[in-house]
Regions:
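Alpha/propeptide regions of enzymes that mature by internal proteolysis
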Residues: 46-48, 439-461
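Substrate-recognition/specificity elements adjacent to catalytic centers across diverse enzyme folds
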Residues: 6, 19-287, 292, 298, ...
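Compact, glycine/acidic-enriched structural inserts
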Residues: 311-400, 446-448, 504
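Structural recognition of the beta-strand scaffold that forms the well-ordered cores
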Residues: 57-59, 275, 287-289, 336-339, ...
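Conserved, charged catalytic cores of large soluble enzymes
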Residues: 232, 417-441, 446, 490
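N-terminal Sec-pathway targeting helices
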Residues: 1-16
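Short helix/loop capping segments that flank catalytic or ligand/cofactor-binding pockets
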Residues: 58-59, 67-68, 177-179, 284-285, ...
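Hydrophobic alpha-helical segments
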Residues: 408-409, 415-417, 424, 464-525
Length: 525
């Protein structure tokens, strides 16, 4: 048995050697946290320090330099997270993970996250565009400075920040990531599809017993959905659920597949925030707490930072006061999302309004490429997308859109297996996919607010996702406000957006937006 002992010894040596190599690689990938780094684009030195509570403090001679500094530290500590998220929203995961993430890429290309982000960027003020540009420069130049070293994920997958082009981040990526957060917190379209699916086998009463608006509530619509869908001939005539030949996914690919399956489902998730006026506290000052519940991830979704800069002027003549804000940032965005300034604090929970509607688009059997509208037949808007797939050739995706939005049944397998694709397609109307979405601009303005009224004004342009915000300032003013855009629907819309509606009937179209002043609010000035 001497050979067994020698083999075991060789195995141990090999394991230790491999472990040593991994350890060396991990150490080499650690960011440089001490000393000085020359960062291109800075107009003056930026001071960066980290305290015992794991809060990163960034102070620049201008707001633009401070945002460059935040981009720098996000790249240092969350480089792979930024790269993965960039690829996710751009539909470029399959380039490094192979065919197992192809469904994810197809969905992202169909939603057109980056294309819409580019349009939304043009509608932002010069000041906000400059802030996003400065932040992107901080990320890009962090990699060029040598202070950021590729983590093992880059090595294992044979890629670099920004992929082949080396563009690690851009302003439209920040807007794209804001849209991704809105998608994650949207929550309604998955429930609509669940009601469509259940309508194939349940009657009206059973459907609402299984899927009520909330447990114990009455049906949200008087329309007999199973009868309506049966009358329209929505469902596929036979089972189309045959297993597809796809490779066994790795961990990242499995996450991607699970995400595509569950996107649009928010049931059971929750957060909490609290604000207590000074009349109920020992100190006589308000107390505010926030506990947002987002998905568990490693690294975490949030990154805590303190941003400081003197008063100044941004492009477009935007005069701003001194910047002094601390709280939770999102890697990918240059502002504190949840936190406080010297004068006011705020916290979010998800409001969960109905901002997504699915539409059944009736197809013209005699004219391929046409769908029915209230005024007749219309051509789909179409564009071709090329997806690079590791280990195989490129995949060309033909994306279709209607007057409501992208056709998601083309890229969601569970949709195409359920409906009769010869007669119908399913499109998505989603509030976030509008060119006037200025959520990121509202985020910038909140970071300068010093009172509750200033904060309420800053949130005026917040669009998606709608959030329930509690606020408190040092003057003792506390308030609650739902901030964001909610679509209005006509009284004749009897389905009320709780299940897929006939897209060719104008009564189911959105009619506008609820004015900001009419959003739910409580003010205890």
């Amino acid at each position: 048995m001497k050979w067994f002992g020698r083999l075991a010894l060789l195995g141990l040596v090999a394991a230790l050697s491999a472990g040593g190599l991994v350890s060396v690689q991990l150490l080499r990938s650690m960011p440089k946290l001490d000393g000085q780094v020359k960062l291109q684009g800075l107009k003056a030195p930026v001071q960066i320090s980290r305290d015992s509570s794991d809060v990163t403090h960034i102070e620049g001679a201008s707001a633009l330099d401070t945002w460059r500094g935040l981009g720098f530290v996000h790249a240092q500590e969350r480089g792979w997270q930024l790269e993965f998220n960039r690829r996710l929203m751009r539909g470029e995961l399959s380039e490094i993970l192979g065919a197992a993430t192809l469904d994810t890429d197809k969905l992202m290309r169909t939603l057109g996250i980056i294309g819409m982000a580019q349009k939304q960027l043009q509608g932002l003020s010069p000041a906000t565009q400059a802030a996003l540009q400065a932040y992107s420069e901080g990320i890009q130049n962090a990699w060029l400075s040598g202070a950021v070293r590729p983590s093992p994920e880059f090595k294992l997958l044979g890629t670099q920040a920004g992929g082949p082009k080396g563009q690690a981040w851009s302003p439209e990526d920040s807007l794209g990531w804001a849209l991704m957060m809105a998608l994650d917190l949207g929550g309604n379209w998955g429930q609509e599809f669940a009601r469509l699916s259940a309508s194939k086998v349940l009657n009206h009463e059973q459907l609402w017993q299984l899927l009520p608006p909330y447990p114990g509530e009455k049906p949200a619509t008087t329309v007999d959905l199973p009868a309506l869908y049966a009358q329209l001939g929505v469902f596929a005539p036979k089972d189309k659920s045959a297993a597809r030949d796809t490779p066994a996914p790795n961990a990242l690919a499995q996450w991607s597949a699970d995400w595509v399956r569950d996107v649009g489902i928010l049931e059971g998730k929750g957060s909490n925030n609290w604000v207590v006026p000074g009349s109920h506290t020992v100190s006589g000052k308000p107390l505010l707490a926030n506990d947002p519940h987002l998905a568990l991830s490693s690294p975490a979704i949030w990154y805590f930072a303190h941003l400081k800069a003197p008063a100044g002027e941004l492009p477009g003549g935007h005069q701003h006061p001194a910047l002094d804000v601390i709280g939770a940032t999102l890697p990918g965005l240059p502002f504190v999302v949840l936190g406080r300034t010297q004068g006011v604090a705020w916290g979010f929970t998800n409001t969960g309004p109905d901002v997504q509607d699915l539409y059944l688009e009736q197809l013209d059997a005699t004219q391929p490429g046409q769908y029915r509208t209230p005024t007749g037949w219309a051509a789909f808007e179409e564009r071709a997308e090329t997806i690079r797939v590791k280990g195989q050739g490129d995949v060309t995706l033909q994306v279709r859109s209607t007057r409501h939005g992208p056709v998601i049944s083309d890229v969601q397998p569970q949709y195409s297996q359920l409906i009769d694709g010869q007669r119908y397609a399913v499109s998505l109307r989603w509030s976030a996919l509008t060119e006037d979405n200025k959520t990121v601009e509202a985020g910038m303005l909140t970071n300068w607010a010093q009172t509750v009224p200033e904060l309420q004004k800053a949130f005026t342009d917040n669009h998606s996702p709608m959030q329930s915000v509690v606020m408190a300032d040092t003057l003792g003013h506390v308030a609650y406000k739902a901030v964001g855009k909610v679509p209005t629907r006509s009284a004749s819309n009897d389905i009320r957006g709780v299940a897929p509606s006939p897209g060719w009937l104008a009564q189911y179209d959105w009619t506008g937006w609820l004015p900001y002043a009419q959003n739910p609010a409580v003010d205890a000035a």
